[in-house]
């Protein structure tokens, strides 16, 4: 009997916790779907599509050598064209 009561209280607590910590219903999955669909139609609206501009040859490329337009960075400077 005690175990049954403990289980019922635990289930009720976990159910209440789920509802309390859940996202607002205004931002439910259906809204995420429509937002993603709109971003697919309008590529400029997509945050994933935005890339940083590449660095011109002779520019300091620092610790991110992948940002050189030529993809070739030696001793911190972009080379090539």
UniProtKB/Swiss-Prot annotation:
Record keywords, A-Z: Amidation, Cleavage on pair of basic residues, Disulfide bond, Hydroxylation, Ion channel impairing toxin, Knottin, Neurotoxin, Secreted, Signal, Toxin, Voltage-gated sodium channel impairing toxin
Taxonomic superkingdom: Eukaryota
PTM comment text: The difference between delta-conotoxin PVIA and [deamido]-delta-conotoxin PVIA lies in the state of amidation of Gly-80.
GO molecular function annotations of the record: sodium channel inhibitor activity; toxin activity
Signal peptide from the UniProt entry: 1-22
Residues found modified as 4-hydroxyproline: 57, 65
Modified residues (Glycine amide): 80
Propiece span(s): 23-49
Protein name per UniProt: Delta-conotoxin PVIA
Organism: Conus purpurascens (Purple cone)
